[in-house]
Amino acid sequence: MAFPMPPHQTAYDRAATIFSPEGDLYQVRYAFEAVKKGWTSLGIKTNEGVVIAAEKRFIGPLVDIDDIDKIYKIDDHIGVAFAGMGGDGRILIDYARVFTVRHRLLYGEPPPVELVAKVVADVKQAYTQHGGVRPFGVALIFAGVNPDGTTKVYRTDPGGQYFSFKAIAIGSGEQVANEMFEKHYRSDMSLEEATKLALKILYAIIRKTVEDKEKAIATLPDQVELAYITVKERMFTKMTKEQVKEIVDSMREELLQL
């Protein structure tokens, strides 16, 4: 005797290439859920440059958190952070790096930030319309300074879409982060102000799991990663833990008020 399959186990659910009657690709939707479970990453653009920040979590007493990377250099003028499945993110980041090298060799100049985001989004899109593959369960934030000096931040989604933002967050804390961006982001922010805003946001997210404010502040330098690219130098720079701690110490009273 044959039994009907539950609605959540229909063909639309199993195949990445079949639309449901509602117009959904369920596997793509599920890939978005993988992103929402990831550690939070942020991108902020200012007139002085861009800031990339990411959350790192203590996942076990034997794990060396200092060797966990959430922010990567794509080229001198572009950095990237991700949320979702780390292996998927690594593959796409390597693809973006190879693309930028080829672009420099062919055209003698670095590619615009949007072009790098687009080619990665194109790869993601291709994995939503071919059999035998699954969508990438990762979202990426590309932030950088274009050859003409303009600053850009892009988010690429599992379905192949990419969007430009002034400030954006992805991952498990994206709702908290984006609400804080809407309240506190200004287009005339300095790079220093953007860096402090990123730290405030990540502190607020960490406080969701750490009740004691003093402990959250003390562990903040261990649980965040920060990088920036200035319009003047156009050189990807990742901050050391000591540099992050210095900034955290300078804004201690502000953090205690959150």
Curated annotation (Swiss-Prot):
Q: Which GO terms describe its biological process?
A: proteasomal protein catabolic process; ubiquitin-dependent protein catabolic process
Q: Which UniProt keywords apply?
A: Cytoplasm, Proteasome
| Gene that specifies this protein | psmA
Q: What is this protein called?
A: Proteasome subunit alpha
Activity regulation, in the record's words, is: The formation of the proteasomal ATPase PAN-20S proteasome complex, via the docking of the C-termini of PAN into the intersubunit pockets in the alpha-rings, triggers opening of the gate for substrate entry. Interconversion between the open-gate and close-gate conformations leads to a dynamic regulation of the 20S proteasome proteolysis activity.
Q: What Gene Ontology terms describe where this protein resides (cellular component)?
A: cytoplasm; proteasome core complex, alpha-subunit complex
Return the InterPro entries for the record.
Ntn_hydrolases_N, Proteasome_alpha, Proteasome_alpha-type, Proteasome_asu_arc, Proteasome_asu_N, Proteasome_sua/b
Q: How does it assemble?
A: The 20S proteasome core is composed of 14 alpha and 14 beta subunits that assemble into four stacked heptameric rings, resulting in a barrel-shaped structure. The two inner rings, each composed of seven catalytic beta subunits, are sandwiched by two outer rings, each composed of seven alpha subunits. The catalytic chamber with the active sites is on the inside of the barrel. Has a gated structure, the ends of the cylinder being occluded by the N-termini of the alpha-subunits. Is capped at one or both ends by the proteasome regulatory ATPase, PAN.
Annotated HAMAP family: Proteasome_A_A
User: Chief subcellular site?
Assistant: cytoplasm
Q: SUPFAM superfamilies recorded for this chain? A: N-terminal nucleophile aminohydrolases (Ntn hydrolases) (SSF56235)
